[in-house]
Amino acid sequence: VFIAAAFFPHLFTHYGQKEMFKAWLPSTAEHLLGTNSLGYDIYTELIYGTQETLLVGITSSAAALALGAVIGALSTLKGFAGAVFNGLINVFVLLPKLITLIVLASFAGGSVKDLIILIAAFSWVGAARSIRSKVIHLNAQPFIENCVIQGYSKAHIILRHILPNLYDVLMARFLLSINSCIMMESTLSFLGFGDLYHPTWGTMINFAYKRGAFIRGAYNYLLSPGVCIVLLSLAFYLISLYFEQRMKLISGR
């Protein structure tokens, strides 16, 4: 439903994104969640905010996964190089992620691109640790040792035997990362570091709080984006559990 709303918002609302009405209208058949202080339909704003929220979540998660996969794989190397990348993972594990993000976001431009870069830069550690653990496990398997004994090149072993066995862990980490990336974006946007020209659900909560929605009793304006954030995060989490279970079944064979 959320993905459909992101790609086909006109199927869910017949109002335009910037179509204005009387401010602070209550919930009615014409305006399901009422209108905000500027007269925008809150339900329509929620539908169009789905696209921006998913854009940040999926893009930053994909970037974090790519970075984490590379660093995680390189950390399994023997010698100095492997120790450096493993040390890098350990350093980022100890960093207070949210506080660091807030400090850096205060110096960034506040655009969607800046948010994606910042969130991705601090979301790769989980993927790196999972990939590192999986690669070490695979390297200890008899079929990998047989490939080495038979003289297959490292490229052949990686492409034909390592990468195919990483699919489930990559998908699980990707979906879990979307969950955390959406939460981080929502937190930063609520604190005022989001892009005002591309409002997400977090930005909606920020606007609602600043414009006195609570005082006016416009609880729909405050609660609806928060409920959507929770439901979307829960959906990605449940899908990630499926891939984690598959990974455990395959590892147990």
Language-model features, listed with the residues they occupy:
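N-terminal signal-anchor/first transmembrane alpha helix
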Residues: 1-17, 88, 166
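Transmembrane-helix boundary motif in ABC transporter permease subunits
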Residues: 9-10, 56-90, 102
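Periplasmic/extracellular loop-to-transmembrane helix junction in inner-membrane transport proteins
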Residues: 17-60, 207-224
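Generic hydrophobic transmembrane alpha-helix motif, especially the helices
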Residues: 32, 36, 76-77, 81-137, ...
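Transmembrane alpha-helices
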Residues: 51-67, 155-187
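Glycine-rich helix-loop "coupling/hinge" segments at transmembrane-helix boundaries
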Residues: 106-108, 135, 184-224, 228
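C-terminal transmembrane helix and the adjacent membrane-cytosol boundary/short C-terminal tail
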Residues: 121-122, 175, 217-253
